[in-house]
Amino acid sequence: MIEKIWFDNHILGKLMWPLLWPLSCLFKYVANKKKLDYFTGKKTAYKSSVPVVVVGNITAGGNGKTPVVVWLVEQLQLQGMKVGVASRGYGGKAPHYPYLLSNTTTPDISGDEPVLIKQRTKAHVAVAPVRSEAVKMLEEQGVDIVITDDGLQHYALQRDVEFIVIDGKRRFGNQAFIPLGPLREGLDRLASVDFLICNGEQPKTNEIAMTLEPSKAVNLVTGEKKSVSNLGELVAFAGIGHPPRFFDTLASLNADVVHTQGFVDHKAFEPEEIKNLMQYGEQLIMTEKDAVKCQSFAESSWWYLPVDASFPEEKAQQILNKIIEVKEQYGLSSS
């Protein structure tokens, strides 16, 4: 319901305005004060020995940050760089922090997105509620550069390049601060970052268009790959920031979806609640992020759909050139 208030101008937003507006003012004040403390030197931000690239947003919820992180890691690896990824590890509970993921780390330990990034890229991935602690651990691993998955508002960490990922369809909703609206920071923040990435729809001025390109569906048990349109009837579910985006993608691929089910982002699934979805059909399809949480109890009729971030070639090169330029300023060789 809260997202209907934020993005759909629901009547409940007007009814709850007297309650939510003062809380939004308080959120804005606290957020601005926290930021100002670092900008004025009242608090000291950690300066890494390697370049730090932040991929974040100014709204609550999922905007497509993780595919951007994966794309950046893979592109920089092709340049010969040893890349590390820092994350808060939301949804996981590690035995200690900072925590360095291994190839066998599960989402209940580190959260779903760090596991996805680790599996996709084989990069060093560290999690910690205080992201600067994760960055320090990655420095100990000898990385050349660190990318943080989210963390735009984590001003305790100095950064060299900033990305804001924008949901091209929902944009900034009612443009109010949390909890009346989705904003973590004001729209003026857009002018201070290096790159604005528009996920879907038509980008505005100074924004770079990004599309999420789906590939073939992958079977969770066998690893078999098939075109979504050839799978037959499917029950689709998604526990991401905006589940309808996933369902729209399936529709664009001519998937035969007979039932959809959205869950909250980062939800820890119980085996039975997923298996219960099979009452609507014999085959399930999910996002790659959900697949890492369902892998341990998956059945042979379950599939996931990987997606990859895609940018216009000229813009992609512009992004890479900026990061390489910053890295060279640190005096680090990419060979």
UniProtKB/Swiss-Prot annotation:
N-terminal signal peptide: none
GO molecular function: ATP binding; tetraacyldisaccharide 4'-kinase activity
A single GO cellular-component term on record: plasma membrane
InterPro entries: LpxK, P-loop_NTPase
Enzyme Commission number(s) of this protein: 2.7.1.130
Pathway: Glycolipid biosynthesis; lipid IV(A) biosynthesis; lipid IV(A) from (3R)-3-hydroxytetradecanoyl-[acyl-carrier-protein] and UDP-N-acetyl-alpha-D-glucosamine: step 6/6
Keyword terms, alphabetized: ATP-binding, Kinase, Lipid A biosynthesis, Lipid biosynthesis, Lipid metabolism, Nucleotide-binding, Transferase
GO biological process: lipid A biosynthetic process; lipopolysaccharide core region biosynthetic process
One Pfam match: LpxK
Catalytic activity: a lipid A disaccharide + ATP = a lipid IVA + ADP + H(+)
Residues the record lists as binding ATP: T59, A60, G61, G62, N63, G64, K65, T66
Homology family: Belongs to the LpxK family.
Biological role: Transfers the gamma-phosphate of ATP to the 4'-position of a tetraacyldisaccharide 1-phosphate intermediate (termed DS-1-P) to form tetraacyldisaccharide 1,4'-bis-phosphate (lipid IVA).
Name assigned to this protein: Tetraacyldisaccharide 4'-kinase
UniProt organism field: Aliivibrio salmonicida (strain LFI1238) (Vibrio salmonicida (strain LFI1238))
Upper taxonomic lineage: Bacteria, Pseudomonadati, Pseudomonadota, Gammaproteobacteria, Vibrionales
Gene for this chain: lpxK
